[in-house]
């Protein structure tokens, strides 16, 4: 089983004004999150519990200049964090003694952490209409990824033989549990990545359509 206790807070500052004749809106903030995690499972024949606490300080800022009444430019930068799913954090697992396959979680997974950059230009060319172009980049510092390890032994996983089906070859022949014929599927910490992209969007009401289809 896995439990999480999360505490946090957020401080936000907003401002509007004009600089050198250019109107703008500005927002900045800092979010703090403290996560206490407890993961319990079976290792060998004994229950084991992993506990840890980690803290995240997540600053963010966005600004939106208004060159004209119909054009808005937007820029934003933010540190973001998403915790791993609870199911991937359990130290326990399951085993298939017919196909020599073991699946279990990893209580030491790091959260998804990244710095996100966004730039956008929006043109409101008509009522209820917009054309926008946006570019984004995400510098990912850590993220959980699935890993498949071959040539492993069942005994190295720490799982008890009781998780095997009593009719499986691996249970009936215990020597197979120490042979490197097993495939272990788990989740590990990724080394990071960089994502880039562009988005183009158009929105407009269909005023030219007839009858009930109009707008």
Q: Which residues does each predicted region cover?
A:
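Residues that define the transmembrane beta-barrel architecture of outer-membrane proteins
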Residues: 3-9, 53-57, 103, 113-117, ...
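Short loop/turn motifs that connect adjacent beta-strands in outer-membrane beta-barrel proteins
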Residues: 18-24, 67-70, 128, 207-215
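Structural signature of outer-membrane beta-barrel domains
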Residues: 6, 31-37, 78-84, 126-128, ...
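Surface-exposed extracellular loop regions of Gram-negative outer-membrane beta-barrel proteins
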Residues: 69-116, 137-178
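Outer membrane beta-barrel strand-and-loop segments of large Gram-negative receptors
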Residues: 1-2, 130-215
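Transmembrane beta-barrel strands of outer-membrane/channel proteins
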Residues: 9, 26-34, 73-79, 121, ...
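Residue-level detector of the transmembrane beta-barrel scaffold of outer-membrane proteins
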Residues: 25-27, 60, 64, 72-74, ...
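Residues on the lipid-exposed face of transmembrane beta-strands in outer-membrane beta-barrel proteins
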Residues: 9-15, 61-65, 119-123, 200-204
């Amino acid at each position: 089983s896995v439990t999480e206790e999360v505490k946090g807070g957020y401080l936000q500052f907003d401002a509007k004004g004009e600089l050198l004749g250019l109107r703008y809106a500005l927002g900045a903030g800092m979010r703090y999150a403290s996560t206490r995690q407890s993961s319990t499972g079976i290792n060998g024949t004994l229950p084991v519990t992993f506990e840890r606490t980690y803290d995240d300080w997540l600053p963010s800022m966005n600004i939106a200049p208004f060159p004209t009444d119909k054009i808005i430019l937007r820029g934003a930068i933010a540190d973001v964090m998403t915790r791993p799913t609870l199911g991937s954090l359990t130290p326990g697992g399951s085993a298939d003694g017919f196909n020599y396959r073991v699946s279990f979680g990893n209580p030491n997974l790091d959260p998804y952490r990244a710095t996100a950059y966004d730039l956008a230009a929006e043109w409101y060319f008509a009522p209820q209409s917009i054309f926008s172009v946006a570019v984004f980049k995400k510098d990912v510092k850590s993220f959980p990824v699935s890993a498949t390890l071959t040539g492993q032994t069942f005994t190295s996983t720490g799982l008890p033989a009781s998780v095997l089906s009593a009719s499986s070859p691996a249970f009936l022949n215990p020597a197979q549990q120490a042979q490197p014929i097993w495939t272990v599927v788990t989740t590990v910490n990724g080394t990071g990545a960089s994502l880039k992209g562009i988005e183009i969007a158009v929105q407009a009401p269909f005023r030219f359509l007839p009858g009930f289809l109009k707008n």
